[in-house]
Amino acid sequence: MTKTKQEIYNKRPTSPHLTIYKPQISSTLSILYRMTGVALFFAVSILVWWLILSKYDNNYLQLAECCIIKICLVAVSYAWFYHLCNGIRHLFWDIGYGFSIKLVNITGWCVVVGSVLLTVLLWV
């Protein structure tokens, strides 16, 4: 007995949906690494534009005193430190070190704690 294409298609296994997976530190940090890379592209572009404008008009420089701008600068610096720390982690992976589950989890938490500490050290 021959099966039609539709019957074969209906019996194909489907991939599990993302909602059934428990988020792990490695997957969460991987997604955040990509997100911070994109966010930093735009943030640094805006920051450079702002610095160029502040050279010609001091009003732009005075914006740095605004609380919202300071919060944004802290967030950008955290994203930068996070991206830096996770990039160093990826460099170790590139040379073949740190692929055990235990080391992946330890280095993941080191990235999170390290980026927070570096941000605090910068702004305090």
Swiss-Prot record:
Name of the molecule in the record:
Succinate dehydrogenase cytochrome b556 subunit
| Keyword Electron transport part of the UniProt annotation | yes
What the entry lists under Pfam families is as follows:
Sdh_cyt
Q: Which family does it belong to?
A: Belongs to the cytochrome b560 family.
Which species is this UniProt entry from?
Answer: Rickettsia conorii (strain ATCC VR-613 / Malish 7)
The protein's job, in short, is:
Membrane-anchoring subunit of succinate dehydrogenase (SDH).
InterPro entries in alphabetical order: SQR/QFR_C/D, Succ_DH_cyt_bsu_CS, Succ_DH_cytb556, SuccDH_FuR_B_TM-su
Residues annotated as binding heme are 83
Ranges annotated as spanning the membrane: 30-55, 68-88, 104-124
Keywords for the protein's UniProt record, in alphabetical order = Cell inner membrane, Cell membrane, Electron transport, Heme, Iron, Membrane, Metal-binding, Transmembrane, Transmembrane helix, Transport, Tricarboxylic acid cycle
- For the Cytoplasmic compartment, the record's topological domain ranges are 1-29, 89-103
Q: Show the GO MF annotations.
A: electron transfer activity; metal ion binding
Any GO CC annotation of this UniProt entry:
plasma membrane
Q: How does it assemble?
A: Part of an enzyme complex containing four subunits: a flavoprotein, an iron-sulfur protein, plus two membrane-anchoring proteins, SdhC and SdhD. The complex can form homotrimers.
**Protein's GO biological process:** tricarboxylic acid cycle
Q: Which residue intervals are topologically Periplasmic?
A: 56-67
> What pathway is this protein a component of?
Carbohydrate metabolism; tricarboxylic acid cycle
Cofactor stoichiometry and binding remark: The heme is bound between the two transmembrane subunits.
Compartment list: Cell inner membrane
As for membrane topology, the entry says: Multi-pass membrane protein
What cofactors does this protein use? heme
